[in-house]
């Protein structure tokens, strides 16, 4: 899968629509061998300003010599902006690779009777994978 194919897949999922429940994301990360359990995470919550706080914290830690990875939403220009390693957005090639791996898991999930994950759930699973495959998870602080 190349970057354009990855973007076509992401866009095909649709941006809007809330489907309450954890079944989709739980099933998806299970098929991906729970990448979220392999990373140390600072999880930022709240109503407003989460992306700014995550970005500030990521840059502060990177500037102090820490290895960091950051996942934020939404993006400004490209989806790659949502996933950064040491302050640098992941490459188009890495984005395509984690999209392909996640899509395979989504296809299996649907084949097994699961409900279509939302675009946000798919991108979140992709972020977990990118932080495992691209970075050194045991040496990084992940901010999301």
Put a short name on every predicted segment.
Residues 127:
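Short acidic active-site motifs
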Residues 133-144:
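Single conserved hydrophobic/aromatic residue that forms the stacking wall/gate
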Residues 101-120:
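ATP-dependent adenylate-handling ligase core
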Residues 130:
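Feature captures the FAD/FMN-dependent oxidoreductase FAD-binding
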Residues 4, 19-22, 89-92, 96, ...:
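Electropositive phosphate-/nucleotide-binding environments in soluble metabolic enzymes
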Residues 1-46, 53-66, 71, 110-114:
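Short functional linear segments
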Residues 56-104:
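N-terminal phosphate/diphosphate-binding loop that engages ATP/GTP or pyrophosphate donors
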